[in-house]
């Protein structure tokens, strides 16, 4: 199925690209989320008319993500207290939601889907650098310090 992308999508293309994707991916993800439209003659004309508006929206999203990245870079280490044993091993773990909530409490809005933990949840006390992806082009690093609750 050929679609016209209305947003930049990682590993697929940029705004305005006509790409061939599997029908299920288009029907179940791209079209309902408003990230693409079916590539037919009428939609191509409508897209060309809206292209400037969509590019401006994309630029505004990128600028907002860059501002959030600067705020995150300015943050001191975010401290998360969790129950832990004598050797620093946590009873449980610190995951995406915990990190997102702690950063939001520190003053920078962060969704749990933006936190990247490629090795899984954090299970020990200590200092960690966690990557957050605010936009397809914007990444930032949050310093997280996990301490044992008294």
Swiss-Prot record:
A GO CC term attached to the entry: cytosolic large ribosomal subunit
One Pfam family it belongs to: Ribosomal_L9_N
Protein name in the entry: Large ribosomal subunit protein bL9
Organism domain of life: Bacteria
InterPro entries assigned: Ribosomal_bL9, Ribosomal_bL9/RNase_H1_N, Ribosomal_bL9_bac/chp, Ribosomal_bL9_C, Ribosomal_bL9_C_sf, Ribosomal_bL9_N, Ribosomal_bL9_N_sf
Organism annotation: Shewanella oneidensis (strain ATCC 700550 / JCM 31522 / CIP 106686 / LMG 19005 / NCIMB 14063 / MR-1)
Family: Belongs to the bacterial ribosomal protein bL9 family.
Record flagged with keyword Ribonucleoprotein: yes
HAMAP family: Ribosomal_bL9 (MF_00503)
Gene Ontology BP terms: translation
GO MF annotation: an example: structural constituent of ribosome
Keyword Ribosomal protein found: yes
Function: Binds to the 23S rRNA.
Keywords for the protein's UniProt record, in alphabetical order: Ribonucleoprotein, Ribosomal protein, RNA-binding, rRNA-binding
